[in-house]
């Protein structure tokens, strides 16, 4: 079993080692190229692979709620606002982009993204649906980074009992 959160530059090497040794892979690496994603999905034929942009149970639930809201409110404006600490490099974050993919799949709309880098914020994501006279906001706030490690260990435990395939965090819930 390998758990990998490195940069995209190291991803291909760890995937190759897992395939060679027939070991499961849990990856939280964001910023992967389309080619790397395809390689990961293809490798799912050979080993169990789980990829997630975020290993928080709360974000997994948020994603499901966003999917439902996106189906019902597809004629509303949709914005995703995310905030992280000042040292976070990618903007928008991988989690914001994943939420955006959920919005697109559910509603057919591309959301607007707004990224903040401030202080020591662990991670906040809000998906806002707005229409004339009303607004629905779905928000998740991480206040402690331990939740991500706990989620990765949960994923590793669950994926170890799964057959070969490509999985996402929500598939384990």
Indicate where each model-derived feature is located:
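Rossmann-fold NAD(P)-binding glycine/threonine-rich loop
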Residues: 9-21, 27-51, 57-69
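Short loop or secondary-structure boundary microenvironments that flank
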Residues: 7, 29-30, 55, 85, ...
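Short, surface-exposed loop/turn motifs that are enriched in glycine and acidic residues
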Residues: 51-59, 85-92
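N-terminal Rossmann-like NAD(P) cofactor-binding module of classical short-chain dehydrogenase/reductase
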Residues: 2-3
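Short N-terminal helix-initiation segments at or just after the protein's N-terminus
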Residues: 25-27, 76-77
């Amino acid at each position: 079993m390998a758990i990998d959160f490195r940069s995209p530059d190291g991803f291909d090497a760890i995937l190759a080692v897992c395939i060679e040794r027939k070991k499961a892979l849990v990856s939280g690496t964001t910023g992967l190229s389309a080619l790397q994603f395809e390689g990961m999905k293809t490798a799912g034929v050979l080993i169990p692979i789980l990829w997630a942009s975020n290993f928080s149970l709360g974000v997994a639930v948020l994603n499901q709620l966003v999917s439902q809201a996106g189906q019902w409110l597809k004629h509303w404006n949709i914005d995703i606002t995310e905030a992280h600490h000042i040292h976070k490099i990618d903007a928008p974050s991988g989690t914001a982009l994943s939420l955006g993919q959920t919005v697109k799949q559910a509603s057919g709309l591309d959301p607007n993204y707004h990224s903040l880098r401030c202080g020591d914020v662990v991670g906040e994501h809000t998906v806002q649906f707005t229409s004339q006279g009303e607004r629905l906001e779905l928000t998740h706030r991480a206040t402690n980074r331990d939740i991500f490690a706990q989620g990765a260990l949960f994923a590793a435990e669950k994926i170890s009992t799964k057959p070969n395939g490509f999985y996402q965090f929500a598939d384990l819930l």
